[in-house]
Amino acid sequence: MLAEDNTTIKTYDQDVWAKMPDMTLPLAPSLQIIEGLHVRWTNLLSALPEDAWSRKATHPERGQVSMDDMLEIYSDHGHNHAKQITDLRARKGW
């Protein structure tokens, strides 16, 4: 979306992804990946010129979305995962 005009965003089957062989690894490597991505994205997104936020891509489930929309979607997605983890911890007494 930042490197290509009007690109199509590729989706994937989350259930299949969750069953990949690396699901048995400790949590730490996955958290390190997420932390690294967030460091890179913070650097990239904070340096974007204003006009980049209106760049468009096609999302198979949402239709046309802007860079601004995608940041909101990703942020909401992360908050939802954090809530799921918090709720699971409360249910399990962790």
Residue ranges and their predicted role:
Residues 1-17, 42, 56-94:
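Short, contiguous alpha-helical
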Residues 14-54, 74:
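Acidic/histidine-rich alpha-helical segments that form the ligand environment
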